[in-house]
Amino acid sequence: LFYQYHPYTTEWGPMHWGHSVSDDMIHWKNMPSVLAPDQEYDKRGCFSGSATEKDGKHVLIYTGVSNVQMENGSIQERQNQCIAYGDGEIYVKSPQNPVITGDMLPADCSKIDFRDPKVWKKGKNYYLIVGNKNSEQKGQVVLFSSKNLEKWKFETVLAENSTGQIGTMWECPDFFELDGTHFLICSPQNMKAQKYEFHNGNNSVYFAGKYNETEHTFQKEAPKS
């Protein structure tokens, strides 16, 4: 089990990845942190992500947060996707990090709000979705593909908040198939209250739909909570 963790205080701080293990899902043993913000590309935090397996090793994929200086001298945050390889105890960050940067996104996609990668393997390829928002402050999920987990290609905006009613940034997306139907789960920020729902601003919704694996299109139904 991996989780967001700031080991030094009970207040918000640069995120680490905590680590616990169990052989029965009931009794857990705390392990040393597996990721710490110790590189230039993630010095402001190792945000959440997901994991897969390659060649018998764990592969953690996470969002590294850093700052960049703009041409006018101002400082702006950047969120990029990074990987680390491990054996269940010790994890080493790839020298290729960050493996996905905001510069790989279309021009109208945010480089600041670009986080929480979910990875999976289909056939010989790996796929990854990341939460994002566009220049109109509407949430969306973007899709990338790779053959080796280190060189990635932008594919498409898989789903978006085209109506403007489903919040701004879409955090922590997940995408999977269940009984022939694909589901996209995400946590939109800044949702507007609707009757008895969405009164805390940050929520979780899911979309059911059909995914075309060749064209990378997702025909989604209306969101449900």
Where are these regions (language model features)?
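Short, well-structured alpha-helical interface segments that form or flank functional binding sites
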Residues: W170
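Beta-rich carbohydrate-recognition and catalytic domains
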Residues: L1-D116, W120-G167, E177-S225
